[in-house]
């Protein structure tokens, strides 16, 4: 019912590993005619932009870019990072990535302007990270079938816990608050029609994905990490450094743990992976803090001084 004469679907496109492979599947396997959509909120790296350009060029696909007020978005992140540094709280790390949630708002605009209803996402179910909300004191819902939690009661609970944490550092009550809350609204409260996730129907296989992207499309990898996950995200290096320094693990640990549970890799393989993946991404972190106009040494000194949640 979704196939049309010209374009069939919208593909939200970050230039990352999963969205790129999704586009490959949509064109090569499903034989659909997509248009891609990218939301630039100020933390899309040059690496991601190059991969977006490379992939869309090779596959002959149009890329619609909706750019936020980049300077304002970065100012918002800076205000929230300053507030976080005054009272470091692992449960509040999500405030630093709140600006990208308007991705969900503008996909509706793209649907309206193109007349295309179907949007196919490359969200990987193995990416679920319960610990991020867990650091706020929220217990995981293992029956949740989505990467992002939805529903009024769940969101009200989440925001009540976050509000209490915000009181510990009043700097969070700044001009970015409306942007944060409205982004959360579009992500978690608005009705999602004709949204489908490719990897709900197609097996996600890391080796196949990496080989396809790199060998067939000359997809560019990062120079400061062995992983291909989130390498186009300007925030990932910093928040994973914080999690690893304070808690002793990162989202890479949870990702590999999910793979173990699925029987995809062994525990020994997972430990070998995270030994490399959890190493600090100096270049990514430096870019992030420089872009925000923050002093690298001062910020890292605060992070390193946070009391650890583990014993050596």
Please give the residue ranges for each predicted region:
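Hydrophobic positions on the alpha1 helix immediately C-terminal to the Walker A/P-loop
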Residues: 21-22
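Short, glycine-rich nucleotide/cofactor-binding loops
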Residues: 9-18
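Nucleotide-activated chemistry modules centered on ATP-dependent adenylation/adenylyltransferase
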Residues: 1-8, 25, 29-312
């Amino acid at each position: 019912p979704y196939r049309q004469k010209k374009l069939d679907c919208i593909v939200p496109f970050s230039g990352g590993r999963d969205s790129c492979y999704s586009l490959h599947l949509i064109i090569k396997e499903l034989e659909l005619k997509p248009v891609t959509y990218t939301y630039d909120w100020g933390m899309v790296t040059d690496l991601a932009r190059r991969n977006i350009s490379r992939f869309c060029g090779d596959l002959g696909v149009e890329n619609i870019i909706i750019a936020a007020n980049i300077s304002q978005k970065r100012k918002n992140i800076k205000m929230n990072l300053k507030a976080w540094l005054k009272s470091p709280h692992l449960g509040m790390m999500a405030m630093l990535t709140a600006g990208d949630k308007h991705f969900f708002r503008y996909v509706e605009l793209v649907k309206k302007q193109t007349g295309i209803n179907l949007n196919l996402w490359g969200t990987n179910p193995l990416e679920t990270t319960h610990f991020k909300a867990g650091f706020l004191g929220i217990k995981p819902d293992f029956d949740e079938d989505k990467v992002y939690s939805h529903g009024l009661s769940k969101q009200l609970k989440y925001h009540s816990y976050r509000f209490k944490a915000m009181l510990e550092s009043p700097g969070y009550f700044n001009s970015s608050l409306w942007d944060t809350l409205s982004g959360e609204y579009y992500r978690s409260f608005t009705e999602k029609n004709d949204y489908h996730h490719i990897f709900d129907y197609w097996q996600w296989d890391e080796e196949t994905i990496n080989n396809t992207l790199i060998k067939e499309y000359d997809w560019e990898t990062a120079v400061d990490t062995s992983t291909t996950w989130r390498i186009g995200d300007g925030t990932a290096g910093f928040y994973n450094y914080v999690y690893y320094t304070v808690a002793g693990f990162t989202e890479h640990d949870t990702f590999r743990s999910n793979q173990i549970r699925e029987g995809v890799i062994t525990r020994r393989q997972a430990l070998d992976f995270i030994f490399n993946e959890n190493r600090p991404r100096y270049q990514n972190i430096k870019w992030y803090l420089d872009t925000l106009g923050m002093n690298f040494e001062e910020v890292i000194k605060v992070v390193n001084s946070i009391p650890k949640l583990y014993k050596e």
